[in-house]
Amino acid sequence: MPKKRRKLNKDFEKKIYTSKKNVELVLAKIYDIDDEDIQKEYMSAFNDVVYSYDQLKNDYELTGFNDNSDKLISDYIKAFSLFESEFEI
């Protein structure tokens, strides 16, 4: 039986790309922190954001744009906003 094609969405791909760049930027800033204890604190807080981004990216790569996509991007945005509000970087 032929494999079902993923449904693609260019606007959603742009959001994923922007999310990737935001995650990379914050991780670079965290790695630049000299104090190891503070760096660990920031990394543990940022892990939720990275996890949300990974779920978003993996879901899109495996199944494409679907009913769950909007929820995943919303979860990522909430996690990123929460991190930004609690930590100054």
Enumerate the predicted regions with their spans.
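Secondary-structure edge/capping motif, primarily at the C-terminal ends of alpha-helices
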Residues: 26, 30-37, 60-63, 87
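Acidic, low-complexity, intrinsically disordered interaction modules
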Residues: 37-74
